[in-house]
């Protein structure tokens, strides 16, 4: 038996004792986070799949894992040798979890499926319960966390220190943010709200932490009432300075595990709960007169950056651009000298970023995919998969950093030497898609779905496509993936507004061959106002040359060439003052106009 088989056997012994026919393991934590602390990585522990998105479902005789297109290839590799069947989300023929369970449990009498109500959202449990009852009378049990019994040496809850995010970077006081939130609550006829999302809590309080790898958040809950603000957090996270700061801002402190008791005795008439962010367990704990089921107003506020945050982004992008130029100048000669691998170049890039002022951490684990690994959208090199780089072909490097004044996210695909005509063609198609999105002008309030087609059209014309989103929101020294705004094919109703930060990251992936992705972090800014309304534009924030050696110039339109040359001129003008002479010469060559 391998390790995963042993874990499944222990789970099934527990399921048998508890009279459960199946158990569901999500990728989330008690706060519905995308990236979670080690304590909540139960889906990874039970399946061996370490992607940030996915759901494992185990019955007494079978097991399956659902994940999205970013992880199809990685999941195939990681699930190999286990009994898990890979379920590819949004691919025709893939059953839903409820459909699969309905079929797997059709011969089981009075089947009961378990899940932990503390790490599954209220809306998810409600919808799944309805689907299971409709399909075959399957009931849900929500009061069991099997990991507490079967996961030996399970990591404890994180207890890392919390720090104050200075006003010079936050741009708005805690008191001002709370006042805006209360104003929104009054419009929704709510007396208070529970905030579960960790980045929403950090943003509201102008605090940051290190409880989650690469994400400057801290495990906590926040209860905002009409006349009181309560933070539920373990006391040992807070220094005397942070405690005084919270006291000065009239924030009351309670232990993290007291949130349920507080909700049970909540004295206001009603409370707003976001069904996508609030766990099923806490939703059911509320005993007030009325629950206002509505989306939290905080993400929309957080999405529109203020002047200080935008200036922070510009400063962070300068620092990150300097680190990237130093790295790219080093990369090809180092590969030609021999001995460099996907892991070693990742370490080099992180070390160069760490030299920059206000560097705190990377913003996600670097994706450095050489050759066929570049086709694995969210590839992460391990000692088992790491390969030596050769002075030929393409390497895709998706990386980012957390600086105290801003978060960065950038992808560059680099030709390490000679490339094939197919590589040039695919690379140029991706570049065209990237540029077309940066060129677009659009009405204030347009959706990300409308913009998504602009970038993809040149690919669609040739029968190519990619299944991940074209762009996601980016936090301000917060999570690198931030909502509610996105640019993607699926309908996204959130209107795009000036001040929002996003990524522009189209890609194409040829399984077993190579992958190409080009990504800038961008800012939505004002373009013009006419009798037809206000119009917006996309402004690149990322400052880093785009490799021109794999470009088939004949494929580019004049406006695309003009954009690339203007972008490279800006990159050189802004970064060169911070470089030494050799680095300036390298950057000047890397940003030469193409014709």
Protein language model features and the residues they cover:
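Active-site neighborhoods and metal-handling regions in enzymes and metal-associated proteins
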Residues: 1-595
């Amino acid at each position: 038996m391998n390790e995963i088989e042993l874990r499944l056997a222990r789970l099934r012994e527990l399921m048998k004792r508890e009279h459960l026919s199946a158990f569901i393991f999500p990728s989330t934590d008690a706060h519905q986070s995308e990236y979670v602390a080690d304590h909540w990585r139960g889906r990874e522990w039970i399946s061996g799949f370490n992607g940030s998105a996915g759901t494992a479902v185990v019955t007494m005789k079978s097991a399956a894992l659902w994940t999205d297109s970013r992880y199809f290839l990685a999941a195939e590799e990681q699930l190999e040798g286990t009994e898990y069947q890979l379920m590819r989300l949004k691919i025709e023929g893939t059953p839903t979890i409820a459909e699969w369970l309905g079929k797997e449990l059709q011969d089981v009498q009075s089947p009961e499926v378990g899940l932990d109500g503390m790490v599954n959202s209220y809306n998810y449990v409600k919808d799944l319960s309805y689907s299971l009852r409709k399909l075959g009378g399957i009931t849900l049990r929500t009061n069991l966390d099997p990991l507490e019994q079967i996961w030996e040496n399970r990591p404890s809850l994180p207890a890392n220190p919390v720090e104050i995010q200075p006003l010079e970077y936050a741009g708005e006081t805690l008191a001002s943010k709370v006042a805006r939130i209360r104003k929104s609550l009054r419009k929704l006829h709510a007396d208070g709200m529970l905030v579960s999302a960790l980045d929403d809590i950090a943003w509201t309080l102008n605090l940051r932490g290190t409880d989650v790898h690469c994400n400057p958040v801290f495990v906590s809950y926040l209860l905002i009432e009409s006349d009181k603000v309560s933070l539920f957090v373990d006391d040992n996270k807070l220094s005397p300075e942070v405690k005084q700061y919270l006291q000065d801002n009239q924030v009351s402190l309670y232990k993290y595990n007291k949130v349920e008791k507080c909700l049970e005795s909540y004295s206001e008439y009603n409370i707003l709960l976001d069904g996508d962010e609030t766990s099923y367990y806490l939703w059911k704990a509320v005993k007030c007169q009325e629950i206002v089921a509505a989306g939290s107003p905080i993400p929309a506020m957080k999405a529109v950056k203020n002047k200080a945050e935008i200036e922070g982004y510009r400063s962070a992008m300068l620092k990150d651009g300097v680190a990237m130029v130093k790295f790219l100048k080093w990369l090809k000669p180092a590969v030609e000298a021999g001995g460099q691998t996907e892991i070693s170049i990742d370490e080099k890039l992180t070390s160069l970023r760490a030299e920059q002022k206000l560097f705190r951490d990377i913003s996600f684990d670097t994706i450095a995919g050489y050759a066929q690994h570049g086709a694995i959208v969210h590839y992460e090199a391990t000692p088992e998969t790491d390969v030596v780089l050769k002075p030929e072909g393409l390497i895709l490097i998706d990386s980012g950093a957390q600086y105290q004044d801003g978060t960065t996210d950038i992808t560059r695909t680099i030709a390490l030497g000679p490339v094939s005509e197919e590589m040039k063609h695919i690379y140029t198609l991706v570049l065209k898609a990237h540029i077309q999105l940066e060129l677009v002008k659009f009405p204030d309030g347009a959706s990300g779905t409308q913009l998504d087609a602009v970038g993809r059209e040149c690919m669609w014309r040739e029968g190519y496509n990619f299944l991940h989103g074209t762009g996601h929101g980016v936090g301000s020294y917060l999570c690198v993936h931030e909502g509610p705004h996105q640019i993607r094919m699926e309908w996204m109703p959130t209107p795009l507004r000036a001040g929002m930060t996003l990524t522009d990251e189209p890609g194409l992936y040829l399984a077993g061959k190579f992958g190409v992705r080009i990504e800038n972090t961008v800012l939505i800014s004002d373009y013009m106002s006419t009798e037809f309304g206000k119009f917006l534009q996309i402004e690149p924030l990322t400052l880093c040359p785009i490799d021109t050696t794999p470009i088939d110039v004949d494929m580019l339109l004049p406006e695309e060439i003009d954009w690339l040359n203007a972008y490279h001129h800006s990159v050189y003008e802004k970064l060169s003052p911070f470089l030494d002479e050799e680095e300036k010469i390298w950057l000047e060559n890397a940003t030469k106009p193409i014709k």
